[in-house]
Amino acid sequence: MSHVRRKRITAIYSTSMKDDNAMIVKSHSSKESKRDPRVELSDNEYISNDEKDSTDAKPAADEPQLELNCSSSLSSSDDDSSVSSSISSSSELDALSEPGLSSPNAVPLVYKVPHESSKAIQVARRLENIHASVQKDDDYMPKLCINKSMVFTDRQDQVAEYERLLEIRLKYKNAFKVPPTLFADQLLSKAEKYIPLVEEILRGERPSMYYDNARKAYQKSSRALLSVEEFRQLDLKTFTAGYFGIKRQIRLSTEILSQYQDKLSKHRNPTVQWWGPTDFSHYVLAPEILSYVCRDELGLADIDEAWTYMESTTEYGLNVADEEPLDIWELEYEEKKLQRLGLGPKYSSMTYRKHPARASAVVDTSKNGSKEHKRKGKQHKLKKGQQSTKIRVSKKRRRVQPHSICD
């Protein structure tokens, strides 16, 4: 054992070390035995009774203080000696931090809590109390339940809407023999051959009822362009493609714009400029092209009859046709909705329409028919030629005369 260690032990315990393996017995007073046995005593805790009394006599500070029991221990080896310090465990610090539980032998390190930190602690406690009260109110709040009468009313409204559509459908089917509503592919296939008529309409070489209505709307306006307020005041029934409806009318207009967007944008006609390329295509050109499709579907004599028919079936287009699926993939949604509402086949649009796939199969079968089919085809072409001749001759009795759209 080194000389420094022997001298240190002799000074603390007042006994001499006879050899390196001598047993050291420490005697503790009754006051020290009351301390926590779990806390290991360090060498610096062996102080005189006078120092203990002076430590106990220190008054407690008014402000919060944090007392740390710091102890130092010396360790040495045969070669050299070093000094190390240790801090008691967190459980001991917590115990010593409470008033009245401070160790008499502890070396107090006074720590003053900043005023800002105390305020932060108070605010945090207030927030915790508020959160607890809110959580308590949420626990007692009754859960929101869906009212069954609301669901039943919504179902009743949907069923009533289908009843109304069925009534309008049957009314126009009986009075006007409205053709089956076309899908988007069918519509574009029938209207494709009439799209080039846009050139003649823009040059003023072909009369147009819808252009005449558009020009009247422009003449009533005092603005250079069609405003939102003026558009809302327009009677859109005069710009609707009859039984085709607005939805199919807009679909055809998209195809027209893909071909004539630039030409419409650069056109110098004041009516075209007032409406703008998009609206002029939506509400003038598209319904005009669909008028020729209507003439073919119904086998009418001239375009005047088609215009009259289109004006008479506008209610059907806005209420029935616009509610029917435009594409084939929408049929599944319609069927599921009818099943959910418990409605029969008479409410389905496919009861009054032809599926495009089945219709194309019928056309392919008819193409392989007999000579009688070819003979009827020639007669049909002859009748169609006679009708077109009659249309060209009857220009004088049309209510819509060719317009000077180029001016």
From Swiss-Prot:
Segments for region (Disordered): 17-100, 354-407
Annotated Basic and acidic residues bias: 29-41, 49-61
Keyword annotations: Cytoplasm, Nucleus
Record's compositionally biased regions (Basic residues): 372-384, 392-401
Compartments, as annotated in UniProt: Cytoplasm; Nucleus
Pfam families found in the cross-reference section: RTC4 (PF14474)
One GO cellular component term: nucleus
Family matches, as InterPro entries: RTC4, RTC4_C
Low complexity bias locations: 71-97
Free-text function comment from the UniProt entry: May be involved in a process influencing telomere capping.
Family affiliation: Belongs to the RTC4 family.
Protein name as it appears in the record: Restriction of telomere capping protein 4
Organism for this UniProt entry: Eremothecium gossypii (strain ATCC 10895 / CBS 109.51 / FGSC 9923 / NRRL Y-1056)
